[in-house]
Amino acid sequence: MIILIDSGNSRLKVGWFDPDAPQAAREPAPVAFDNLDLDALGRWLATLPRRPQRALGVNVAGLARGEAIAATLRAGGCDIRWLRAQPLAMGLRNGYRNPDQLGADRWACMVGVLARQPSVHPPLLVASFGTATTLDTIGPDNVFPGGLILPGPAMMRGALAYGTAHLPLADGLVADYPIDTHQAIASGIAAAQAGAIVRQWLAGRQRYGQAPEIYVAGGGWPEVRQEAERLLAVTGAAFGATPQPTYLDSPVLDGLAALAAQGAPTA
């Protein structure tokens, strides 16, 4: 059994992959903890049906958090290898000028999405809405040409609340023409997030001559879903397309499982 770890800025998501089980079994459902609650990780490890052999993970929460996670795993008899982005893995080619500068979570997420595809597939747009929002494209040639990073919905809201003298920590509904400050902030955040998706969808369509399929993930997606789907529908209609995002619960863990299954380079 191999433990899969996705250590984000706010949440720690965990799962497992068992290459020795029939059909290389996965966890029934991933489990998420607050990233500061490593006792919860230890308790979860104690519930596993088998003793894990090792762990594979990504960590964007800093060196100290990675060391604390590793110590918790070692206490359970399990060492971890932290993934780094590679120039090439699982058929996915990294287009970054310096491939290892790409966040390991983004790399694993793209590997997870690509692992779901048939050998011939359209362009893929992978959008993850966490503390940061990332939008990454995979071409039909399995090349990642680049992507965007912007503050996630909660970070945008916090920046306005704590970086200004008079704006509140907004809790409002999205509207075309907001009529109070809470609505104005909520609508601006949704517009920024949705606009980034539409921008990259249009860029992919222009680059590849066909509309990208959209995959979305992350805890911030429900907040922007309605606005994103509305703008995508309006934009797609101009090209006779109906872009419809597909939500994935744990594409980073899916990517880690795929890499572990194939013995692909991880560091």
From Swiss-Prot:
It comes from the Bacteria. GO terms for cellular component: cytoplasm. Pathway: Cofactor biosynthesis; coenzyme A biosynthesis; CoA from (R)-pantothenate: step 1/5. GO terms for biological process: coenzyme A biosynthetic process. A monovalent cation. Ammonium or potassium. The lineage of its organism: Bacteria, Pseudomonadati, Pseudomonadota, Betaproteobacteria, Burkholderiales. Substrate binds at Y96, G103, A104, D105, R106, T181. Homodimer. GO terms for molecular function: ATP binding; pantothenate kinase activity. The gene is coaX. The keyword Transcription regulation applies. This is Type III pantothenate kinase. Catalyzes the phosphorylation of pantothenate (Pan), the first step in CoA biosynthesis. Its cofactor is NH4(+); K(+). The active site is at D105. It comes from Bordetella pertussis (strain Tohama I / ATCC BAA-589 / NCTC 13251). Belongs to the type III pantothenate kinase family.
